[in-house]
Amino acid sequence: MGYTKLNLKDGNIVDEKVFQHIDNNFSQLYDTVGDYSIHISFDDTVACLTNLTKNTYTSLFDEPFFGWLKGLHDMYGAKFSLYVYNLTTLSSVPTTYKSEFFEARHWLKFGLHSKQSGFNYSSETYANAKKDWNSLASGIIKITGTHQSIDRIPRLHNFSASLEAATGMRDAPCGVLGFLAADDSRVSYHLTEAQNAILKAQSQYLDKENGLIILRTNYRGEWLNSADGMYEMMESFLSDSSYVNCFKPFVWFTHEPYVYSASNGLTDKAKVVEDVCKFAYDYHIPFTYPQNELNIKP
C-alpha cells in the first residue's frame, strides 16, 4: 500500500484520509518547514465553547473570547488555534454559528488537547486515540461545516502520547500530521531521548518511520512575569542566534484560563497575546498554521 493522492487547498490537505500506510517514501513527501512565521494557540480551551452552549448570541463574535480573537484578526491579520480540553463540551456546541465559523476557517482552527480535563494519552491505545480524534474531527465539522477548521498538528495535554495513540490519531479521517512538543527539556510524545535532543536543537523532528512531524513549542505566555514586556521579549528573540531555527514557525502558546474565563471575561494577561500579534504585524512576520508550512512535494 502507498499514499492516497494529496489535494491541497489553502495549504490544507483535504483528503478524508491522508496516510493509508506509512513507508520509507515519507522523506520524499515532506521536506522542512519554511520561512519565518508565527503560530499562536490556546490550550485548555473550554470556557468559550461552554458559553456558546449555555448562551444565545446574535453572532459568534458576541461571545467575548471569540469577539476578542476576531478583533486581533481584523487589526493584525492574526490567526489562532484553539485546542479543545473536553470532547463532551465540543459535542454540545450548537450549529447556530456554522456560517461564521466557516467564514473564519482560514484564521480560526480547532485541534485536540484532551478528551477530558487532566487526561493524557501516554498510555492510550491505538483504537481509543483514533476514536477520540474521530470525535474531535466530527465535532468540529458539525459546528463549522468544514474540515478546513481542523488543526492537524495539535498540542496534546502534557505533550504526551504513546506511539499507539499517536498513530491512531494519524490514521483517523482528517488525522494528525504531527504534534507540537514541549517548551522545555521533557521528552515529548513517543520520542526517544536522542530524538528529543534533535528536536530541542533544531525545533523540529521528522519521524519518517511513523509519518509524523514534531515541532517544538518555543514560548508560553505564562513565562512572562507580568503582562508587560511581551513585545520586547519577542524582539529579543530576533537578535538571539540560539533562536535561528525557531521562527520556522515560532510556536507560541498560552492557556485559555490564563487570559479568559466564562464568568469574568478577559484577564489583564490578554495583553501578552495582543503584544505578540502586534509584534508579528510590525515586523511583517506572517501568522500561519504549521500544517500549512510543510513543504509537501508532488
Question: What does each of the following model-derived ranges do?
Answer:
Residues 79-164, 185-186, 248-252, 256-259:
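Metal-dependent polysaccharide deacetylase catalytic core of the NodB/CE4 family, i.e.
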Residues 176-182, 250-298:
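C-terminal domain-boundary segment and adjacent tail
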Residues 55-70, 91-99, 127-140, 227-239, ...:
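Well-ordered, non-membrane alpha-helical segments in soluble/globular domains
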Residues 34-37, 75-81, 105-109, 146-152, ...:
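Loop/turn elements at helix/coil->beta-strand transitions in domains of secreted/extracellular proteins
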Residues 7-10, 15, 25-26, 92, ...:
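Active-site-adjacent pocket scaffolds in enzyme catalytic domains
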Residues 2-103, 252:
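Active-site beta->alpha N-cap acidic-glycine motif
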Residues 30, 53-57, 121-128, 153-158, ...:
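Conserved aromatic-histidine-acidic binding/catalytic patches
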Residues 71-75, 100, 139-143, 168-175, ...:
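Alpha-helical structural signal in soluble globular domains
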